[in-house]
């Protein structure tokens, strides 16, 4: 898959779920940032379908986390695949971002 597709699900007072599919890269990061900027409340980014992420994508995640924190909300990355999870660990963003793997927060 080229590019990034995402869907946003809002269910009452539960966290907003944003499902990511494809590649979060320089071309896609601004679209994701725009979509997340309009959300209020806790956000779960379902990363199970995210196949690739580059530096611009990582920066977009950090900006989203900062925006959520400024509003008093939480951003949680849910089930990143092996390649994405490995990169998050290598650049030590797993110490900055809240990540839930297979139902467990870390």
Give the location of each predicted region.
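STAS-like cytosolic regulatory interaction modules
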Residues: 1-52, 62-106
